[in-house]
Amino acid sequence: MGSNQDFRNLQAKFQTSQPELGELFRKTPKPELNKVLKKFPQTELSEQPKKSSQSELSAVSLKPLQLQFADLPRKPPQPGVLKKSPQPEFPHLANKPVQAEFPRKPLHPEFTGLKKPSQAEFTDLKKPPQPQFASLPKKPPKPEFGELSKRPPQLETPQEPSAPPAQKLLKPEPNNPARPLGELKPKMFWHLEANEAPKRPLPSESSTFPKKPLQPEAVVGFSRKSQPQSESIEVSQTSPSKCGSRELDSHSPQPDISTFPKNNENFRKPSYPQATGCPKSPKQPMFYEFPQTPPRKPESCNPQSHSPLPDFNAFPKKHPQLQPSDLTRASSEPEVCKVPKKTQKPDPNVLSQKPSQPELGHLPRTSSDPEFNSLPRKFLQPQHGKFFQPEFPKGLPRKPKLPGSVSECSLPSASAGSSPQCPLSPGLIVPGIPRWRSEDFQVQRPPRRRPLPSASSLGHPPAKPALPPGPINIQSFRRAAATAAAVLKTGSSTGTHFQAQQPQHIAQNPDEIYELYDAVEATDDSSISPRGRDEMLSTQQATRWPQQEPELRKKATQPQQLPATDPKLLKQIRKAEKAEREFRKKFKFEGEIVIHTKMMIDPNAKTRRGGGKHLGIRRGEILEVIEFTSKDEMLCRDPKGKYGYVPRTALLPLETEVYDDVSFGDPLDMQPFPR
């Protein structure tokens, strides 16, 4: 209970400062208020306290506010009465509302700060509650009231409690019921008060704004009760609705109770009074300057009705709420009638100002209920969410009228959910989608083709062109095709230069061609760019293809298979070419060299050196079979490019070839032997 400790600290501070400030305020407000009371009617007095309260509100000084309050209202007589017997009077009222006593006990530890400020501020029945909030007003109100209220006997009653016992009982009773009703409400809304209690005692302890509404209440009492000046002043806090008649006072202890709990509730429950008191707070637009007076009436509604639901249902339902209240609704109704007669009309306007009033009073809204009540009913409906559903079915009959597609129906539903009050008209949605579909159909349809012209309009077909003059040289076409391919590959001036010289190279002998290869090999590979190498290959290919000799064709394929960039490969190629020439001379081999198959030398075979027309045998070496010369020997070529005879006994067919030739028999057996 941090709030209780803070409250106690403030009590000690205020008690220490009581005599000084009390003396100052006693001296200053007495002459002013006495003069005002003598010269002007209480209505004017009510205006002066309002002005002074406003100035004090701006200053946010709690002590001067209480002093003026004490000066203006009826507090001193009541404190006198309560000093003698504050608790015994409470049991008097306890007979009427038994509930008040029960909540009071638990509430004092929990809401001690709340109850005491309400008593000190509104009723000032006890001096100890006043020092808690501001000990200043206790002392000044006594002399001031002694001076101010010379007319009413009630002012004298505090000094002489036996003179009007009935009135004393009535007055203390309203003061005490103020607590019980405030406590009745804690029973009703115990949790909310417990939550809001620390907040309310804090403003009461700081005595910043909770005391401000006290002034408006006192002012209200003066303005309302101008005829029974002193009596109405004393009783006004108990029930400002009283017309100053003591008969009403006899019946109004209960309504006074309601008024006091209203004040107590202002500190305890700013949220509920505002939430449920939305209808009643507008009735008190006169207290725009004093925010607690509007919540005080709504608070009175809450303790009386014991349920904020009737207030939520309708703002203007003031009388039905007053009816269920057994205690004070009779008194609260006259209060409403007298105080806000002028303001009952601007109720709708006041609704907008209610949130500002709690801000002035610094009464926090701890519940969302006041927010719903402050809003007009039109806005309440969408918030509750119950009225969205009837609006949706209204819009639904329009939706099925839309073209029957799931996507189309979904679009209006989504948009209607965002703004149910303005359902989308089908006219806005329908035309867009069908247009889209029509466009899609048009796009899907193939474009119209123009009809072909008739054969008669075209006439006879043109005649074929004449053949070129002279004999046709087919090789020239081949050369042209080769040059075109070379141009496409190279695309450079050097390539075209070599192509222009191609016919001369073709006419040259094969030896000259080999010399060309030698010249190419002599150049350093590093000096040749990639483009230059490609050009050289293209020129070589162009020169070889036109030749009809099979040997040249075979030789031409080798450089294609092996990249010419590697100098080692080039050397091997040249050696192979020389070996082939020697082979042709030695074996007198004519025709094209064709590789029939490849065979491997048996790894178990005996090795031997080659000599004469025989190749050397090396285990596991693969040889290319060029000719099946006899049953014993075959003409082969080794990987080095040498040619010679190899005995059949040393050769083994490759596994791949064996599987490929299984169905056709051994190719060696099928090969006819030469004679």
From Swiss-Prot:
One of its GO terms (biological process) is integrin-mediated signaling pathway. PROSITE patterns: SH3. One of its GO terms (cellular component) is plasma membrane. Signal peptide: none annotated. Residues 23-35, 141-150 have a biased composition (Basic and acidic residues). Keywords: Lipid-binding, Phosphoprotein, SH3 domain. It comes from the Eukaryota. Gene3D superfamilies: SH3 Domains. May be involved in integrin signaling in neutrophils. Binds to PtdIns(4)P. The SH3 domain binds to PtdIns(4)P. This is PML-RARA-regulated adapter molecule 1.
